[in-house]
Design a protein with these regions (language model features):
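Short terminal alpha-helical segments
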Residues: 1-33, 88-95
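Amphipathic alpha-helical binding modules
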Residues: 70-103
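Charged, low-complexity surface segments at secondary-structure and domain boundaries
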Residues: 11-16, 37-38, 72-80
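Amphipathic alpha-helical coiled-coil segments with heptad-repeat character
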Residues: 1-4, 8, 46, 77, ...
Length: 103
């Protein structure tokens, strides 16, 4: 349960960065990633949520790194606005789903 509560905290921080942060959606996704990278699928107490988290992280790091930029930056450089919004929505949805499960 402790891992799940920590995951909920990090997802809350990521959702907050998306909802109240400044900058473009891509910039806010970058900030949200700094919280998400601290947790892993194993921190999710439910198989469906583990899969959703793994897919989310895969969507954020789908592009190969070029030079020193890293996979996240490479991915954020090629996603369009709609894709970025969908990823952001998935983060917020995962936060709410985990919160409901832990109630």
């Amino acid at each position: 349960m402790t891992d799940a509560l920590y995951a909920l905290e990090k997802l809350a921080d990521a959702a907050d960065a998306l909802e109240t942060g400044t900058g473009s959606v891509r910039e806010r996704l970058f900030e949200a990633f700094t919280d998400l990278v601290r947790i892993g699928p194993e921190d999710m107490p439910d198989g469906e949520l583990r899969l959703a988290f793994a897919e989310l992280m895969g969507a954020l790091t789908s592009e190969e790194a070029k030079g020193t930029e890293g996979r996240l930056v490479a991915t954020l450089m090629i996603v369009d606005e709609e894709q970025a919004q969908n990823i952001a929505r998935a983060i917020v949805d995962l936060y709410h789903a985990l919160g409901r499960l832990l109630r």
